[in-house]
Each structure stands twice: as C-alpha cells, then as structure tokens.
C-alpha cells in the first residue's frame, strides 16, 4: 500500500496535473493500492475508484462514493458530465459538514462569551 498525504498541495496547477498523470501511470503499472489524501475534490475524483468523505468533528466517515469513470483516465474526463455530477455531490456533502462545524463553533463562541 502506498499512502500519500496531500503530496501535490504545494504545486502549481500545471505541475499538479502532470504529477497526477504520473501517479496514475505508476499505479497502473505497479498495481499497488494507493491511499491518497487530498482536499481537492476534482483531484480525488480524477485519481480515485472510491472517495471517502469525512464528517465534522469528531471525524467519522460520512460517506464513501464509488467513482464509476472509465480507465485509463486523462484530463478530458474532467469535462465529462458524470465527473461533474460527482463533483456536485461531493461539494454538497462537504458543504453540509462545513455548515455543521460553523454552527458548532458559533455555539461554543456564544457560550464562552
């Protein structure tokens, strides 16, 4: 298993896409399992077979989504309607969790003040 925790976070957009393609090539050739942690929704969809969304505090798995997009993938997949549907679904899930956290933080702030 190869565990990667936001390895492309500090890269510019073009370099990030080159490295994503390189990771897909390495994965395809090696057959290794890759656990890839990212905050970038489109990166998760592009690279993954499954995307796991964590919930608000305490961190728990909110949902696991199977990404049913053809392989091999190239950057053109990001314009596919199915890709965009996954992106919308993930944004909605994450937005729900952000709102929960904001409400919890506001309640704690109000209690402490």
Regions found by a protein language model. Name each.
Residues 23, 40-42:
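The feature captures the ABC ATPase H-loop/switch
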Residues 2-6:
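Catalytic Walker B motif of ABC-type/P-loop ATPase nucleotide-binding domains
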Residues 50:
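Short, glycine/charged-rich "phosphate-handling" switch motifs in NTP-dependent
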Residues 9-11:
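ABC ATPase nucleotide-binding domain "signature" loop
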Residues 16-31:
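Helical segment within the ABC ATPase nucleotide-binding domain
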Residues 54-89:
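Conserved beta-strand-loop-alpha-helix hinge in the C-terminal portion
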Residues 44-46:
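A short, surface-exposed alpha-helical micro-motif characterized by mixed small hydrophobic
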Residues 31-37:
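Conserved H-loop
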């Amino acid at each position: 298993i190869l565990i990667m925790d936001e390895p492309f976070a500090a890269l510019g957009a073009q370099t990030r896409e080159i490295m994503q393609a390189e990771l897909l090539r390495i994965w395809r050739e090696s057959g290794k399992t890759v656990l890839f942690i990212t905050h970038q929704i489109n990166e998760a969809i592009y690279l993954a077979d499954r995307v796991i969304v964590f919930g608000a505090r305490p961190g728990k798995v909110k949902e696991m989504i199977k990404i049913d997009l053809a392989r091999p993938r190239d950057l053109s997949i990001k314009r596919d309607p199915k890709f965009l549907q996954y992106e919308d679904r993930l944004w909605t899930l994450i937005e729900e969790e952000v709102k929960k956290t904001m409400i919890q933080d506001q309640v704690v702030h109000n209690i402490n003040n």
